[in-house]
Amino acid sequence: MVILIAVPYLLNRSVVGAAPVRAGQVITLGTFRYQPALGWQVDRGASQADLVSVLVKGATTYRLTPLGRQSSAAGAFRAAARRYAATGRGRVGGDPAAVTTARGLTGVVAPITGHTAAGTLTVLVAGGQGLAVSLTARHTAPLTAAIADDVVTMLDSVEVVAS
C-alpha cells in the first residue's frame, strides 16, 4: 500500500515540483536571460522553456514572461497589466515609474494589489522585445529585506541575448 502511494507522489515531485537554483545557473527566455538568486526554487510545474520562468521562495513568487515585439515600455506595460489582471491574482494600479537596471535596460514599474497578495510589475523593453517581471508575496508573509535584495540582483542580471 505504501508503494502505491509513495511512488506516484515521488514521480510527480520529480517531474513537476520545485528545483533549487544552482550556483551559476542562467535561465534564458526568448531574447532575454537572467541569473536567479541562490535560495530560490524553480517552479518546474509553472515554468515553460522560452515562455515563462517562475521562482518561489516561501510565500513569494518571481515570474518572468517575454512579451514579444514591443515598440515602447508604456505599450508593453499596458499589455502586461491587462494580462496580469486577467489571471485574477490581482490588478496593477498607480502610475508606473521609470526604472533602469544595472545593465542599462529601461522600463517601468508599478504596484500590484490583490485580496491575498501584493507586489510589483516591472516591464523592460530592449531591442524591440518586452519582458514582464512580476513579484508577489502573500499578505500573510510580506517581503523581507533579503528577498528584496535578491529581486534587485536578479532584475539587474537581466540581459539581452545576442542573436
List the predicted regions and their residue ranges.
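N-terminal targeting sequences that direct proteins away from the cytosol to non-cytosolic compartments
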Residues: 1-60, 116, 128-129, 138-163
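A short acidic, often aromatic-flanked loop/helix-cap motif at beta-alpha or helix-coil junctions
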Residues: 50, 73, 99-102
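Signature of long, low-cysteine stretches enriched in small and polar/charged residues
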Residues: 84-129, 152
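Glycine-rich phosphate/pyrophosphate-binding loop shared by adenosine-nucleotide-utilizing enzymes
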Residues: 133
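A short acidic-to-branched-hydrophobic micro-motif
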Residues: 52-79, 122
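Generic alpha-helical secondary structure
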Residues: 73-81, 144, 151
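Short, histidine-centered active-site or binding-site loop motifs used for metal coordination
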Residues: 66-68, 136-139
